[in-house]
């Protein structure tokens, strides 16, 4: 947390049919519906999250991600980072408090990769859902579906990875946890973190700007991932790959699609990092094993289906 950016806070997704998407994210993934607003957006959270929402669904003509938000320490930090983003050369816009329900003012910026991100300092604190703050039980007993624990990260496809790396490391205080490099030393994927997590956001080199690969949610155990696979089959949900293990981050994972075609991941495990750790490097000739550790073969759909 070198620059005051603490953690991923929310993601706003575009969906083609709001009620179908809500059934998916609420009843299958197990997120909790927290609110709706006058624009028709739906606000959800995972049970262990302390702020009011982490996922916002907006009905639109095309699927994809509108923006991903990160929480900063306080309003002074937000003001300082807005200035540094401008100095870096980013397109910056201030979104007033309340535009997202019960969220403070936000500073939105366009990364060189073509994705919109935003920073905010304040959001209504609702505490963990379904358990008390004093003498809490282990977990709520009436969770649905996969019982997602938290919104964990997003993976983006876009160009200008080096400039995006410089923005996230120099201005926002992320560090490089893991990477894939070509023979000539060019980095073609970068996994960036703010904490001891394997990553909080990741970028893959792609010819088009602003493409969205997946939104990821954390589960506690491998048995939970297998149970998620059962639920995917029970509900005839479109599956992408898994259950399997990544070489990158070593997370145990399964990927599937929401009704609009946005890719979701649920996973458990994964690597950890401390400040004295060096980045983990994979070479491009081992990309199959890096992505799918067991099969060691690239899956064309996984690599090319984007929103």
UniProtKB/Swiss-Prot annotation:
Catalysed reaction equations from the record: catechol + O2 = (2Z,4E)-2-hydroxy-6-oxohexa-2,4-dienoate + H(+)
BP GO terms, sorted: toluene catabolic process
Domain VOC residue range list: 7-122, 150-269
Reported cofactor(s): Fe(2+)
Principal EC category: oxidoreductase
Keyword annotations of the record: Aromatic hydrocarbons catabolism, Dioxygenase, Iron, Metal-binding, Oxidoreductase, Plasmid, Repeat
Domain of life: Bacteria
EC code(s) of this entry: 1.13.11.2
UniProt: Fe cation binding residues: 153, 214, 265
Pfam family, one: Glyoxalase
Family annotation (CDD domains): 2_3_CTD_C, 2_3_CTD_N
GO molecular function list: catechol 2,3-dioxygenase activity; ferrous iron binding
Pathway: Xenobiotic degradation; toluene degradation
Family stated for the protein in its record: Belongs to the extradiol ring-cleavage dioxygenase family.
Quaternary structure, from the entry: Homotetramer.
Full protein name: Metapyrocatechase
